[in-house]
């Protein structure tokens, strides 16, 4: 945005006081100032919420001015997708009459988000979680292998569903070393930071955040390097694992080979590697072995363990202005907390996460300057206006009938399964309205529906169709949002008639066979319980106890040698073990296929929006008179 455009905005605000500030004066972004955007974790719930945020930032002409993009977990899934879209748009520019690349415009950024809105949701609705189980061989490898985990598998599915379309070489993953953006009008090897200091169209410095189990530090993947970010004021004695530049001439051939093998999808999988759900993502051979030949195995888990908001990266990059879009979970008050072992452990972990989140917010507040950050979350509300209706409160509870939509939305699962249109559009709409409200500090979201000052014309975003349901059928909307909290059996809540009907049809021949061959069932029961289980259960208990003892001696040199020996035979390419575990792998694949073929479709169909009632968008317009008319609507 130019100085003239900013002055025009200020003049409009003076003429039309009811409109409020489209972009606060502190966001005028003087030359050299850096704008940072943090996209929090929270599974696909967060990813979809952030799409609405990106849409409004593009309309307000701020998205092109983002210097630093920090992402965590679900924010990394969508952040990487946006980054690749932008990379493609900037590197593949059309040529003008003189054969020179045409410079991008603000409209390009709006168009990018419009493509993301439809393409990303389509990929989400394929049900990534279940697609990860479709390959029986991959399932078998995940059971026995020490170097192929659920995190490795989900990285492959991320690549297939989201990122493979951007690969220069079809069928190959995108390596981290290929992430650098070189706009069509710039020479290769240019200095991105120097370019950003003067350019109107920034190249965002992407920080994909994970957490190192080795040291407890923040691990970051960027387009130029990877590794741990040392603390400015360390208080412990653990030394962080050093950052490695992809272009470092001192790298060994083994390190260069490993860096070429690490793909963007692995970085995203590490960032979204929720502990206890996914196995830590392991990186072997990244660092040279120790003096005695000890291997350093980097083990990475979800970036949200360290900082689920992604704020630390913005502070490390010394951003002057910061936006944090927070779609992470919220801690509920509890009048009578459960005091059993597991609930106490879970509650304690949630309290710790809340404390870290509060510290991130405090760090933003303590930055120099006044009002140099925007922080909003899923339980914030916005006032709305007749054209852009608010989501009903209260924000801290829900009666399950006709209020508490914000609370229900904040409790939607943070899973990697399919999200219905109702769920996805409501999340996008909420992010869209919240970023508008918190940027403008306006009491009626007057800027929504009015032209974007200095920016691109607004678009008829698909997610705005949810406004019709908010206006006319709040009860039906709430019922959909309440179903969204369940991890399993959602089709049976969303459309019980179809789900149970299909289930009975599928079970009927099985039940008939069991009835006809009841004698066979009895014999099978005796074989499994009285013979196999009778002998295998004690052996399994003894084995588990032995394993626990061995793990307790994990640091003993002799035991480390034993583990290293076992790892040689637990490699993912061991054909004998693949054959041994193929049967359970095939069973998992069959369950996934059944879910995707039938139940996933039932859930998505139940969550479709009803036909539009013609709730049209405001047409783009220009000038104070049109802005005032929109504000007074």
Predicted feature residues:
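Catalytic domains of lipid- and phosphate-ester/thioester hydrolases
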Residues: 1-633
